Amino acid sequence: MSNQHTLLSSNLLPVGSNISTWWNFGSMLLTCLILQTSTGFFLAMHYTANINLAFSSVIHILRDVPYGWIMQNTHAIGASMFFICVYIHIARGLYYGLYLNKEVWLSGTALLITLMATAFFGYVLPWGQMSFWAATVITNLLTAIPYLGTTLTTWLWGGFSINDPTLTRFFALHFILPFLIISLSSIHIILLHNEGSNNPLGTNPDIDKIPFHPYHSYKDMLVLTIMITLLFTIMSFTPNLFNDPENFSKANPLVTPQHIKPEWYFLFAYGILRSIPNKLGGTLALLMSVMILTTTPFTHTSRIRSMTFRPLTQTLFWLLIATFITITWTATKPVEPPFIFISQMASIIYFSFFIINPILGWAENKMQ
């Protein structure tokens, strides 16, 4: 047998013959990461991390830098594509019970948290109205931490308010964190190839395996072509589709936007935060909205790994997806009835999934 590493040899990397298109999102995420890192590198050459020049430097990139508009729009739309792929990737993991591969799942959760932090820091960099106020609201949540809160917030801001030092350190963090994402992604992939991919049926994949190349690599290339075509179509026709109109105005600490909200991919967490009237409670709920994913490998009770043959759990899963979309929608609305109530109910259902799921698994075992 050849001494080549499994990841480098196509013949030594057999994959289950029945893995579906839902297994293509890993390679799509890798493509998004390469795209974001390369466009970000070129943008960093022209960007200026100064509160007086940041907004103007972004306009300079769009107007004066050759093909700067392609770089800037690809980077902005690419972030949305990244999160669409991430959320589908996580949903696939929940549906097919892939979280039982604990190391891969937990490293993936760490990746998600790092990615969210990176995207948040990046959203602040253009120094538009929504960038500034979203940063103010989210970083201010640190003050909810007992005893250390105020000190931590002052340390993060680099002063007693969001100012030039804040933007400088956010740029530094936004530049350095992608390298941590690349490292964590490598760990994630190595841990996955330790055991190999699962399949939609949740059966032993060793029974029927085929080489990754050409069978699955061509399938990957097709989905990647569709994704890149979609990205460039959005960039060409509606480049500001995911942008907030408020962010076309330069940051002004004296004027508060009517409705402060982060980018669409954080709205589910922001909606959960807003649904709780207590600051500390809201902050904990915000953290738990992501951290609760780490509990799934330890609360799985069903004898069957995948949800493919579990209709009760399937119903619960699709309720979770509907809840996720509902919270995202309510977070775009003002804090007033009926949106407060809808948001609170949706948040309860969201967290209930992780409690009811193991109970349903146990009930299904009894019914078999």
From Swiss-Prot:
Compartment(s) of residence: Mitochondrion inner membrane
Protein's membrane topology: Multi-pass membrane protein
State where heme b b566 binds: H89, H188
Give the binding site residues for a ubiquinone.
H193
Question: A single Gene Ontology molecular function, please?
Answer: ubiquinol-cytochrome-c reductase activity
- Cofactor comment text: Binds 2 heme b groups non-covalently.
Q: Which cofactor does it need?
A: heme b
What Gene3D superfamilies does the record tag this protein with? Cytochrome Bc1 Complex, Chain C
Q: Alphabetically list the UniProt keywords.
A: Electron transport, Heme, Iron, Membrane, Metal-binding, Mitochondrion, Mitochondrion inner membrane, Respiratory chain, Transmembrane, Transmembrane helix, Transport, Ubiquinone
- Is Cytoplasm there in the keyword field? no
The residue ranges crossing the membrane are 25-45, 69-90, 105-125, 170-190, 218-238, 280-300, 312-332, 339-358
Q: Which PANTHER family match?
A: CYTOCHROME B (PTHR19271:SF16)
Q: Which family does it belong to?
A: Belongs to the cytochrome b family.
Name of the molecule in the record: Cytochrome b
Q: Which gene encodes it?
A: MT-CYB
